[in-house]
């Protein structure tokens, strides 16, 4: 007596494998597109905030956050006008007495940055975007105007913008496209994170970028 044997033919198996391959390829392509979009957003943050910073200086002859004329102009909290944006990029919770928080309020009131309030914005990966003076709260005359070599936080002197919690691939691509791809030199520098939104170390030292798939970095750029 003959029995019917049920199973998949080689053609059917081949079709299934092709479909699986197409699905996996689409997923990987989609993931790469998402990564590229994040890189573009991070670069846009750096370039946009830099343009807003210099535009504010040109218009008001003062640093946002440090502007001693902000109250007369908008009713905002004044800075002390000493030429230094006091505080750290990851100040939290933000208060108007912190110049690194008033920085955002001044830029928003002036129309150079969208939104309202004093809180730092978040980047494309939900890390903090903030500013601080690389050399710390040093009188302007004492700040050495150098880009390379040993400096203040992040290896910089002067106002810098930092963006935290960046996946290694995003951080490396951002530094490569904007600067020299070297973590410890140039106008963009990175710090390997061990915690979210970390404090920026005194100098950008240590090993090179490492794309492990798990590393995260805080990138800072001299404005």
Where are these regions (language model features)?
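N-terminal single-pass transmembrane signal-anchor helix
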Residues: 2-39, 45
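Periplasmic/extracellular, small/polar-rich flexible segments of pilin-like filament-forming proteins
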Residues: 59-223
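Short glycine-/small-residue-rich flexible loop motifs, especially phosphate/cofactor-binding loops
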Residues: 14, 54, 104-105
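Conserved hydrophobic/amphipathic alpha-helical signal-anchor segments
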Residues: 25, 32-81
């Amino acid at each position: 007596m003959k029995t019917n044997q049920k199973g998949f033919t080689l053609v059917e198996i081949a079709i299934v494998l092709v479909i699986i391959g197409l699905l996996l390829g689409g997923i990987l392509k989609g993931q790469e597109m998402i990564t590229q979009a994040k890189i573009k957003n991070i670069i846009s943050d750096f370039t946009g905030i830099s343009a807003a910073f210099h535009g504010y200086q040109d218009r008001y002859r003062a640093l946002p956050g440090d502007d001693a004329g902000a109250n007369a102009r908008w009713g905002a909290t004044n800075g002390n006008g000493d030429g230094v944006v006091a505080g750290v990029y990851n100040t939290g919770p933000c208060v108007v007495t912190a110049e690194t928080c008033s920085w955002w309020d001044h830029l928003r009131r002036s129309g150079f940055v969208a939104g309202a309030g004093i809180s730092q914005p978040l980047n494309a990966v939900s890390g903090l975007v903030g500013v601080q003076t690389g050399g710390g709260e040093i009188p302007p005359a004492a700040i050495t105007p150098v880009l390379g070599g040993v400096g203040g936080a992040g290896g910089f002197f002067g106002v810098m913008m930092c963006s935290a919690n960046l996946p290694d691939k995003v951080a490396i691509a951002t530094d490569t496209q904007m600067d020299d791809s070297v973590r410890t030199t140039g106008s963009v520098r990175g710090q390997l994170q061990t915690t979210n939104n970390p404090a920026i170390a005194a100098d950008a030292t240590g090993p090179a970028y490492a794309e492990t798939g798990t590393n995260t970095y805080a990138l800072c750029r001299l404005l």
